[in-house]
């Protein structure tokens, strides 16, 4: 009996050592939230391969996450539901302050520009032609909503905003003639279904701003953030990584620091 106990004890000890020898990263899973500019299924198709790529480069596990609409995404950011998050510039300056998210990366060589789209056969030629029009906007989006609304208000162009769930919803509604115009950004416009894009044209484009932030919640260890940042910054040097970036219309990813979003703070936009 004592021999059995000795072997059993040895088995337990060996098992414990084996468990302790597994890299910590193998047990870690981080929730990566993506702003719902497009449908959840579309975002999952685009971003899941990117997260899988980052898994192979860092050894950490990433769970794709989004929300059914932007207000829900905002609540989850406020409550710190995402370990990592890709968020628009306005969200970043809000939730850096309210929830502690800290930017570590952004799109390379990119300035975020808002656009207003109309049906391809629309008579509208200038932004002033939209006076008194009903216009579709994605709820609380920065360049697709807050910027064009602020510009139109400054120019005394009256309009009636109608809020929809996503950028794709804007493009679909304008393409189908439900609204004469709507707000978006170039990246989602290029990414939207040709069924909608081929029936639209861009009426107006804003000036450029610091783009969306890749940010980490303060609970994520700094060495993990550093490893994720390194992997993202190296994507455009690798054929597979470059192809994945191309799928989301990015040339590359570069380091980002909090102060780089001061141009957005200077707008003093109130949603």
Labelled PLM ranges:
Residues 10-19:
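Bacterial N-terminal signal peptides
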Residues 22-26:
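Sec/Tat signal peptide C-region and signal peptidase I cleavage site
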Residues 27-91:
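Extracytoplasmic small-molecule ligand-binding "clamshell" domains
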Residues 28-37, 43, 128-144:
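Short loop->beta-strand "edge-of-pocket" segments that line small-molecule binding or catalytic clefts
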Residues 31-37, 43, 109-118, 195-232, ...:
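Periplasmic-binding protein-like
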Residues 71-85, 98-99, 128, 168-183, ...:
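Short helices/loops that flank or line small-molecule/ion binding pockets
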Residues 99-108:
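A structural signal for short loop-to-beta-strand junctions that line the ligand-binding cleft
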Residues 122, 132-223:
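Pocket-lining segment of extracytoplasmic ligand-binding domains
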């Amino acid at each position: 009996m004592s021999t059995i106990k000795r072997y059993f004890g040895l088995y337990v000890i060996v098992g414990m050592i084996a468990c302790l020898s597994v890299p910590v990263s193998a047990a870690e899973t981080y929730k990566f939230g993506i702003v719902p500019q497009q449908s959840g299924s579309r975002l999952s198709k685009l971003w899941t391969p990117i997260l899988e790529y980052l898994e192979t480069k860092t050894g950490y596990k990433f769970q794709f996450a989004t929300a059914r609409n932007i207000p829900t995404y905002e609540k989850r950011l406020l409550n710190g539901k995402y370990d990592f998050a890709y968020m628009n510039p306005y969200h970043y300056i809000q939730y850096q302050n309210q929830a502690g998210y800290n930017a570590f990366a952004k799109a390379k060589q990119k300035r975020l520009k808002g656009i207003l789209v109309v049906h391809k056969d629309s008579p509208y030629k200038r932004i002033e032609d939209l006076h008194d029009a009903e216009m579709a906007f994605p709820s609380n989006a920065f360049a697709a909503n807050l910027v064009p609304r602020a510009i139109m208000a400054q120019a005394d162009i009256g309009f009636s905003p109608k809020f929809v769930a996503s950028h794709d919803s804007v493009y679909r509604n304008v393409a189908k003639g439900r609204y004469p115009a709507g707000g978006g950004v170039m990246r989602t416009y290029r990414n939207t279904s040709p069924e909608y894009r081929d029936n639209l044209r861009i009426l107006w484009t804003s000036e450029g701003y610091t783009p969306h932030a890749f940010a980490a919640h303060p609970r994520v260890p700094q060495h993990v953030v550093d490893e994720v940042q390194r992997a993202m910054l190296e994507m455009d040097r690798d054929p597979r990584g470059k192809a994945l970036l191309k799928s989301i219309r990015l040339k590359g990813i570069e380091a980002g620091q909090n102060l780089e979003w001061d141009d957005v703070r200077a707008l003093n936009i109130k949603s």
